[in-house]
Amino acid sequence: MLRALGARFLDSAGDEIEEGGLALKALRQIDLNRLDERLHKVRIEVACDVNNPLTGLHGASHVFGPQKGATPDQVLALDEALNTYADIVAALLQKDVRDFPGAGAAGGIGFAAKAFLHAEFRPGVQLIADLSGLSQAVQGAVSFSEDGCTERQKPTAL
């Protein structure tokens, strides 16, 4: 996401690193000189329905990696790479948001949104309901809702 907005992720030689989470192990510097200036003038809200941090046993790699087919060794390597990334971001921005609830969302996009874009996080259903005027639309109505499956990470899980 940050690359698409103009950020460059550099290794120790000043070359751009490869794409992908494991490539973050080689990260040594983040160049924000080309970051889109319009980002400083907007308020960003993120629809986020998970509270996972970026790293650690409850982080993106450990929780979501196995769901995507990552082996235990790949999970550990990815968590190490994400910690490298978080360390560099913390030094660059003088703040560490790796443990922010939602930082581990979408493979770490939550972390980038919070750290670089100062995004505010809201539950997805709340954001959509507010934007669509749902509370006014259903006043006086009876509404039934169902979720196709229950996952352990959802707050409503048993």
List where the protein language model places each region.
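Glycine/threonine-rich beta-strand-loop-alpha-helix active-site module
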Residues: 1-43
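Short coil/turn connectors at secondary-structure junctions
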Residues: 7, 12-14, 39-43, 59, ...
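Short beta-strand segments
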Residues: 43-51, 146-150
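Acidic, glycine-rich loop-and-beta core segments that form the ion-binding/anion-interacting portion
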Residues: 50-51, 55-96
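Histidine- and/or cysteine-centered catalytic micro-motif in compact active-site loops
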Residues: 126, 149-152
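Gly/Ser/Thr-rich active-site loops/lids in small-molecule metabolic enzymes
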Residues: 2, 6-13, 65-83, 123-130
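Glycine/threonine-rich flexible loop motifs
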Residues: 153-158
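Oxyanion-binding "anion nests"
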Residues: 77-144
